[in-house]
Amino acid sequence: MWTIYQHHKGMHYLTLGKALHSESMESQAVYIALYDNPHNSMWVRPSSMFFDNGGPRGGKRFSPLAVVRKLALNESERILGFGYDAWGDGRTQSQFVESYKTNINHLRGQRYVLETTDGGILSTVNTLRLTADTVGLAWLATHPEHRKQGHATILMHAVMALLRHENPDMTFVLHSEIGVRYFERFGFEKASVEHQHFEKSVAMVAANDSEPPSLDGLLKEFF
């Protein structure tokens, strides 16, 4: 579980935990900026500066905004209804939710959620480990009552940052059903024509390397 903080000027930061200074033993906050950070650099600052009241008029410099965590499979019914209006395909909502009990991508994926600090789920995204260095992102959805508030964007930035913290060479792929513009903000580009296999979606890739690795048919299957 990771907490996202909002700076008093509006920027978002993902905390990775705390560390101790090797000489003074002073507590340090370890975090990643979720903006203007193409190399996914980690930063540290004394915890006293992170959690103090150094903001305007004595307010908090950083305030807890939301929590990112992995979703357990047995919690799935809490989020599956989020996608019903987009992917229901004429089924009842109960039929739609029931279908995921045998959906291979749902069962093999690791979902992440963005929650309020009191546990209300706002957005979710599924991650599929396709190779050691490639993750497919799918099923990005927000609770209908909380849409158009930037929650999915925060979750995408956070999940990509966490996975690149694990592996700096991580490449991400996805199939966009909403065009390319939204996902370009996360560094995605339209994949070359040989990777475009589905009429109603656009295959996209985001790689840290200037030369993305071979996708080797990874985008032939819709996920």
Residue ranges and their predicted role:
Residues P168-M170, E177-K200:
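Conserved active-site alpha-helix within GNAT-family acetyltransferase domains
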